[in-house]
Amino acid sequence: MGKTLYQKLYDAHIVHQTPGETPLLYIDRHLVHEVTSPQAFDGLRAQRRRVRRPEHTFATMDHNVSTQSRDIHACGEMARVQMETLMANCREFGVQLYDLHHPHQGIVHVIGPEQGMTLPGSTIVCGDSHTATHGAFGALAFGIGTSEVEHVLATQTLKQDRARTMQVVIQGRCAEGISAKDIVLAVIGHLGHAGGTGYVVEFCGPAVEALSMEGRMTLCNMAIELGAKAGLIAPDETTFAYLQGRPFAPQGAQWQQAVDHWRTLRSDADARYDRTVTLQADDIAPQVTWGTNPGQVIAIDTPIPSPASLSDPIARASAHKALAYMDLQPGTRMSDVAIDRVFIGSCTNSRIEDLRAAAAVARGRRVAPGVQAMVVPGSGPVKAQAEAEGLDKIFTEAGFEWRLPGCSMCLAMNNDRLGSGERCASTSNRNFEGRQGRGGRTHLVSPAMAAAAAVCGHFADIRQFQEPAHD
């Protein structure tokens, strides 16, 4: 019997297994940030251990950084302590750090692929749940806890049980205006926010193959919102073209050798998955969440469902609670829901193609009165590229704030956060209660949908937008 891509990656990284025990896997890349690493480095120090493979360990500052200045004091005492601690730990243990003043600083799941640290066939871990992003390259990538961060720092290995496998097939091609964010929200809406629990999900099908690497990263980024351990997409020519020439990618003769191997990284024709789910791309409309988990999502032209229509009592109770928190009523159309804030950014949607999509909507328009809208590029290189293309001017002329790289309003760990009762159209990945600030109400959308909400002052169907007239 053939193997799935996940099974190939898992088996290739087993360094030790004993009957009845969890296999030990080798970890190729370890990504580190300021929030989940301090105790791990303290553990090394207490045991007088070193970092086993510092050349395969990379650190950045992203969660706590200010997006308005590079002042390490800007986001408060805890943020300052965590960032200064990361700097000291990286100096002591010989780990490469992309600090506040490094031109490549940015969100960890943006800079890894951007710098070519993320490679097909590799295992990648980080003390962050959205490490699944890197699976877009055919890498086995998943988030780990702080004790596991310490273990990988010390040994470059990790014990991991085998996961079940799920194949998600997106047949056909998406209509104009439908993005990877819409695809993955539709998948989560179909399966539920726990529908992937215990699985590694492989995305495939014509609609997935048609996506750019940036779109594929969005898909895999939100696999965790299905409850999945990781997301995967088999590498192909699109993958290789993206990686070629990046700083940490193979060079010269090693490049062709690597590509030859990477071409083998796909599920065999006779591989069996534990579950297969198929969606039709042409059935997917622009998506917007209405509740407090990513599975509570609908098409923009669909009214909010009544909890009474849900057969599962747990889902029904969750919907009642979500509607109360979000201050919404069943039957309401999202296009009738006004917003206060717009956030375009996060490890889900802060790459150059995301900013281009939002700028295409913002060009020649203005942010609606009473709406605060911000655009936060995912890294220094993304910011520089956007400015070279004039996207920053499009945004600022439309009334958006153009910020510095960081995790920003994805989570309430820095100065960018919602006030109680504020409603936000957000390109991030989680709409949990209080995720963007205590009492804040988060609606997940694509970059184009977020920009449309900003200029309309309410949610709008991006398919109805036309390019403004130009002289």
UniProtKB/Swiss-Prot annotation:
Its cofactor is [4Fe-4S] cluster. CDD domains: IPMI. Gene3D superfamilies: Aconitase, domain 3. It catalyses: (2R,3S)-3-isopropylmalate = (2S)-2-isopropylmalate. Transmembrane segments: none annotated. One of its GO terms (biological process) is L-leucine biosynthetic process. Its EC number is 4.2.1.33. It holds the Pfam family Aconitase. Keywords: 4Fe-4S, Amino-acid biosynthesis, Branched-chain amino acid biosynthesis, Iron, Iron-sulfur, Leucine biosynthesis, Lyase, Metal-binding. Pathway: Amino-acid biosynthesis; L-leucine biosynthesis; L-leucine from 3-methyl-2-oxobutanoate: step 2/4. GO terms for molecular function: 3-isopropylmalate dehydratase activity; 4 iron, 4 sulfur cluster binding; metal ion binding. Binds 1 [4Fe-4S] cluster per subunit. SUPFAM superfamilies: Aconitase iron-sulfur domain. [4Fe-4S] cluster binds at C347, C407, C410. Belongs to the aconitase/IPM isomerase family. LeuC type 1 subfamily. Catalyzes the isomerization between 2-isopropylmalate and 3-isopropylmalate, via the formation of 2-isopropylmaleate. Heterodimer of LeuC and LeuD. This is 3-isopropylmalate dehydratase large subunit. It comes from Edwardsiella ictaluri (strain 93-146).
